[in-house]
């Protein structure tokens, strides 16, 4: 009997999150390779080669959500990493320094012993991709330099125009082949193209069920609380090329569909307004942001951030052009016009009444674009919006009082618009 038989989706999420970390620890103990990977770098290549995967962004988000970010940020501060650098990167570099010290001295530093961070091993290689930001290049370059390990970089050009030209897909496919060649050298064996096809098929099954979950937000009232996407996205990031994600997402999507048929909704009849959240979650204050909106009877039914992992492609395409397109069409890797169109589509599908824009100190790419994006979208659909200050992992930047004041104003504007439309 399977250990997961009879588990609900929430239980599966916790089980497989822990198992992914355990897999990496066991692989390290057996002398097998462990890779630290950027969140939207293709995992398909490493999984095909049997390399255990750890995702520093997800790991840092978990540390932030468990209120442990400050200890790691202080370690990074002492190493000279400026507060203006990405806090995911600073948390991860702090954690890496602690692991490195433990490996050298044989003694875990106190800050690591007391940390709520998930226990993951040091990497034997790192792989990064600049399809979400260029900060990842220097971050992973530093990891590789500090640990004296290989760094594989997959270069994905920014899309200044849409649609994506064929020459861009061809270039990215060449980047994929180059990464595969590097892995063959590192692993000392040839790439298994038959297994690669199986891994791509698995990835597409995971993405399919992930999209089933996101689709549930279109119903009114919604059976899906949009904040749940932030929780479940750990597996679409870290395990999309494993059946861990498929099993969990299928269970959650099935549960949501059953609830919809039974008339069971996320807010149990208390849903009054619907909003879009644009940007990364404020992980150290995730509970506050959710509860504040729920207390105002406002439900999140739109967010583009988890949709970054809507990485559907043709697994039968041996040229890898389809896969290349999937990894480059991510909305924050495209021009402002396309970003606006993506957000407008999400807002329409989710039947939202307004938007919360997270001006994230860490994520300059998303935050700087959001100022202009917000105005363009308001001109197009007339829906109100507010901006809130915060950070994805550094708890010091977010002000609960500011958040509460601004979202209350947003809800008042949304309710006024609804009353005027009646």
Curated annotation (Swiss-Prot):
Disulfide bonds: none annotated. It catalyses: (R)-lactoyl-CoA = acryloyl-CoA + H2O; (2R)-hydroxybutanoyl-CoA = (2E)-butenoyl-CoA + H2O. Its cofactor is [4Fe-4S] cluster; FMN; riboflavin; Mg(2+). The keyword Mitochondrion does not apply. Its EC number is 4.2.1.54. Activated by the LcdC protein. Binds 1 [4Fe-4S] cluster. The keyword Iron-sulfur applies. Keywords: 4Fe-4S, Flavoprotein, FMN, Iron, Iron-sulfur, Lyase, Metal-binding. It holds the Pfam family HGD-D. One of its GO terms (molecular function) is 4 iron, 4 sulfur cluster binding. InterPro entries: FldB/FldC_alpha/beta. The elimination of water from 2-hydroxybutyryl-CoA or lactoyl-CoA occurs in a syn mode. Belongs to the FldB/FldC dehydratase alpha/beta subunit family. Involved in the acrylate pathway for the conversion of D-lactic acid to propionic acid. Catalyzes the reversible dehydration of Lactoyl-CoA and 2-hydroxybutyroyl-CoA to acryloyl-CoA and crotonyl-CoA, respectively. Heterodimer of an alpha (LcdA) and a beta (LcdB) subunit. This is Lactoyl-CoA dehydratase subunit alpha. The lineage of its organism: Bacteria, Bacillati, Bacillota, Clostridia, Lachnospirales.
């Amino acid at each position: 009997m399977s250990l997961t038989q009879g588990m609900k989706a929430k239980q599966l999420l916790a089980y497989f999150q822990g198992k992914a970390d355990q897999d990496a620890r066991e692989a390290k103990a057996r002398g097998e390779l462990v890779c630290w990977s950027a969140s939207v770098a293709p995992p398909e290549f490493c999984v095909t080669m049997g390399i255990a995967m750890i995702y520093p962004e997800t790991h840092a988000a978990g540390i932030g959500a468990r209120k442990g970010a400050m200890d790691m940020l202080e370690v990074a501060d002492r190493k000279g990493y400026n507060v203006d650098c990405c806090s995911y990167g600073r948390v991860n570099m702090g954690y890496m320094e602690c692991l490195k010290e433990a490996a050298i001295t044989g003694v875990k530093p106190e800050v690591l012993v007391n940390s709520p961070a998930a226990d993951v091993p040091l990497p034997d290689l790192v792989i990064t991709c600049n399809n979400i930001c260029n900060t990842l290049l220097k971050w992973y370059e530093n990891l590789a330099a500090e640990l004296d390990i290989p760094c594989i970089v997959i270069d994905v050009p920014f899309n200044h125009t849409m649609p994506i030209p064929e020459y861009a897909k061809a270039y990215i496919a060449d980047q994929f082949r180059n990464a595969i060649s590097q892995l063959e050298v590192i692993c000392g064996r040839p790439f298994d193209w038959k297994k690669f096809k199986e891994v791509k098929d698995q990835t597409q099954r995971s993405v399919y069920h992930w999209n089933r979950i996101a689709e549930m937000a279109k119903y009114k009232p919604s059976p899906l609380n949009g904040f749940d996407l932030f929780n479940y996205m750990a597996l679409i990031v870290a395990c999309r090329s494993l059946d861990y994600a498929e099993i969990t997402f299928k269970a959650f999507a099935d549960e949501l569909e059953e609830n919809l048929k039974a008339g069971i909704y996320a807010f149990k009849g208390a849903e009054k307004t619907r909003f879009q959240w644009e940007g990364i979650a404020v992980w150290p204050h995730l509970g506050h942001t959710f509860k504040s909106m729920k207390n105002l009877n406002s439900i999140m039914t739109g967010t583009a951030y988890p949709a970054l992992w809507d990485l559907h492609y043709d697994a039968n395409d041996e040229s890898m052009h389809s896969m290349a397109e999937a990894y480059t069409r991510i909305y924050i890797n495209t021009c402002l016009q396309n970003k606006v169109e993506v957000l407008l589509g999400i807002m329409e599908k989710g039947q939202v009444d307004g938007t919360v824009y997270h001006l994230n100190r860490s994520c300059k790419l998303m935050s700087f674009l959001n100022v202009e994006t917000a105005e363009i979208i308001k001109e197009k659909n007339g829906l109100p919006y507010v901006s809130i200050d915060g950070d994805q992992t550094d708890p010091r930047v977010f002000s609960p009082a500011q958040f509460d004041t601004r979202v209350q104003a947003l809800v008042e504007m949304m309710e006024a618009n609804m009353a005027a439309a009646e």
